[in-house]
Amino acid sequence: VGPGGECGGRFGGCAGGQCCSRFGFCGSGPKYCAH
């Protein structure tokens, strides 16, 4: 995970069971997980 919460590519996955949104940020909920 990057310093701004980025995920995917070189940043890798998210901690704590969070999802990576299609925009490349970690979070939870449908807007992060449903893509």
Curated annotation (Swiss-Prot):
GO molecular function: chitin binding
Cysteines joined through disulfide linkages: C7-C20, C14-C26, C19-C33
Keyword Disulfide bond: yes
Chitin-binding type-1 domain ranges (all copies): 4-35
Tissue expression per record: Expressed in leaf, flower, stem and seed with highest expression in leaf (at protein level).
Stretches of the chain forming a coiled coil according to its record: none
Keywords noted in UniProt: Antimicrobial, Chitin-binding, Disulfide bond, Fungicide, Plant defense
Known role: Has antifungal activity against A.niger (IC(50)=5.4 uM), B.sorokiniana (IC(50)=2.0 uM), B.cinerea (IC(50)=1.6 uM), F.solani (IC(50)=3.7 uM) and A.alternata (IC(50)=5.0 uM). Binds chitin in vitro. Has no antibacterial activity at concentrations up to 10 uM.
Protein name, UniProt field: Antimicrobial peptide 3
